[in-house]
Swiss-Prot record:
PANTHER family: EXOPOLYPHOSPHATASE (PTHR30005), RETROGRADE REGULATION PROTEIN 2 (PTHR30005:SF0). Its EC number is 3.6.1.40. The keyword Hydrolase applies. It comes from the Bacteria. GO terms for biological process: guanosine pentaphosphate catabolic process; guanosine tetraphosphate biosynthetic process; nucleobase-containing small molecule interconversion. Belongs to the GppA/Ppx family. GppA subfamily. This is Guanosine-5'-triphosphate,3'-diphosphate pyrophosphatase. Catalyzes the conversion of pppGpp to ppGpp. Guanosine pentaphosphate (pppGpp) is a cytoplasmic signaling molecule which together with ppGpp controls the 'stringent response', an adaptive process that allows bacteria to respond to amino acid starvation, resulting in the coordinated regulation of numerous cellular activities. HAMAP family: GppA (MF_01550). GO terms for molecular function: guanosine-5'-triphosphate,3'-diphosphate diphosphatase activity.
Length: 493
């Protein structure tokens, strides 16, 4: 592999040190290595902001691991940044001097505002939707809040509160009591209050979280079969569960890993304060943050206003997809959707996910014609899909698995991107679109009327079409039978 195509971004955070190594290929990035080590640098700061020798040694030990990987990458293509703890530490110079010797490249201590800007760029490059957004990143010693639209930020704030510092300040007795949560939330709201008006002034339509706390919440909700939207009600529910556990060392929540458990209560308290103070309705997980912002900055790639479309194009190119056929199926599925939208009330994001499934439905053919839907589902589950959340990836994989042959209803109910009923509806439309576009020519797609009454679908074809298309009739009859097996009434006329 040509080393000139490799790039590395290292984030010396207050809780963890992270390294991301990517390969640049045809204007997009391919992740090669992700290494994360819990260093808890912020825990080594005393009241005089002096960083302990033990904390520094933990950091240097981690950097020795990173240094081995950096030997393969040209120095101009490496960026190392340090954040809140090393902004605060009075003896940061000592740590940084040795860090630079270990890594063999410069270490830059960035301002809170620059950290917020880079986080936003990482989100903008990897997270779907170009609407006005609020980005929240709870770090070990600072929390960044950024508003913006597309690639442009409108406000940037870095606040002195984080999951490690709040752990040491409000949960130092390791007691998960209501009083400790109350104190932690009140303190976080006090920190937020001076910037809340400006954030609300700029406004947002969507809110995304880019931190370990939000990642932990996503893992918990996936494990417990909830949908992926984080809400205040869910946060309060998890807080009560933590309080029931009593002590930090006894904290057990389904889906919460041991690695994340230590700073989870403090991060949860900060997030509850943010939701409450800013009246956030819901939040989803971002696709990237600081490290992705660093990488895309080195590559000087413009932010694609439609990240999902870029992702679909890259995958289609990689797996040699017949894009004419993909577009034909998508056009037909969209036509069906418009005909039933008054009855089914499918939301715009669900429509977008249906059309994404149409664009990807044939990627399994790149493996083998036999069991192509299984191959397609496997690929989508395991590919990196910038712009799509983990739950959305799971839905796409489930739709591709069920694009033909008998329906696996349980798989449609096990995804949590959309309600089970909506997943069933999207699946039905996808299957019909694939069936009627099967001859791969626009002029051979018949005029089809589709009507929905509750879950009953009535499909009307031109009067003599079935008589002149015996194979088509056989395929439609088979599809009607398969749908009837899972109690999806389909009447063909």
């Amino acid at each position: 592999m040509n080393s000139t195509s490799l790039y590395a971004a290292i984030d010396l955070g207050s809780n963890s040190f992270h390294m991301l190594v990517v390969r640049e290929a045809a204007g997009s990035i391919q992740t090669l290595t992700r290494i994360k080590r819990k260093v808890r640098l912020a825990a080594g700061l005393n009241n005089d902001n002096h960083l302990s020798a033990e904390a520094m040694e933990r950091g240097w030990q981690c950097l020795r691991l990173f240094a081995e990987r950096l030997q393969d990458i040209p120095q101009p293509q490496i960026r190392v940044v340090a954040t809140a703890t090393l902004r605060l530490a009075v003896n940061a110079g000592e740590f940084i001097a040795k860090a630079q010797t270990i890594l063999g490249c410069p270490v830059q201590v960035i301002s809170g505002e620059e950290e917020a800007r880079l986080i936003y760029q990482g989100v903008a490059h990897t997270t779907g939707g170009a609407d006005q957004r609020l980005v929240v990143d709870i770090g070990g010693a600072s929390t960044e809040l950024v508003t913006g639209t597309g690639a442009q930020t409108t406000s940037l704030f870095s606040l002195s509160m984080g999951c490690v510092t709040w752990l040491e300040r409000y949960f130092s007795d390791r007691n998960l009591a209501q009083e400790n949560f109350d104190d932690a939330e009140k303190a976080a709201r006090d920190v937020l209050r001076p910037v809340a008006d400006e954030l609300r002034f700029h406004g947002w339509k969507v809110c995304v979280g880019a931190s370990g706390t939000v990642q932990a919440l996503q893992e918990i909700m996936m494990a417990q079969g909830m949908d992926e939207r984080i809400t205040l009600a869910k946060l309060q529910q998890l807080k009560q569960r933590a309080i029931q556990c009593g002590r930090l060392e006894e904290l057990e929540i389904e889906g919460l890993t041991l690695e994340r458990a230590l700073v989870f209560p403090s991060g949860l308290a900060i997030l509850i304060a943010i939701f409450t103070e800013l009246n956030i309705q819901s939040m989803t997980l971002a696709g990237g943050a600081l490290r992705e912002g660093l990488v895309y900055g080195m590559l000087h790639l413009a932010v694609d206003q439609d990240i999902r479309s870029r992702t679909l194009r890259n995958i289609q190119r990689r797996f040699i997809v017949d894009t004419d056929q993909a577009n034909r199926v998508a056009k037909l599925a969209d036509n069906f959707l418009k005909q039933v939208e008054n009855a089914w009330h499918i939301e715009p994001i669900s429509r977008e996910l249906l059309l994404s499934a149409c664009q990807l439905h044939e990627i399994g053919l790149s493996v083998d014609f036999k069991q192509a839907p299984y191959h397609a589902a496997y690929l989508v589950r395991h590919l990196d899909l910038p712009g799509y959340t983990p739950a959305q990836k799971k839905l796409l994989a489930t739709l591709l698995l069920n694009q033909t042959n008998p329906v696996d209803l349980s798989s449609l109910h096990q995804q949590n991107a959309v309600p089970p009923r909506v997943a069933e509806q999207l699946c039905r439309l996808l299957r019909l679109a694939i069936l009627f576009a099967g001859r791969r020519r626009d002029d051979l797609v018949p005029e089809i009327t589709l009507q929905a009454l509750n879950e009953n679908l009535t499909l009307t074809l031109p009067s003599d079409w079935l008589a002149h298309h015996p194979l088509g009739k056989e395929l439609i009859d088979q599809e009607s039978q398969w749908q009837s097996y899972v109690h999806w009434p389909l009447d063909v006329r």
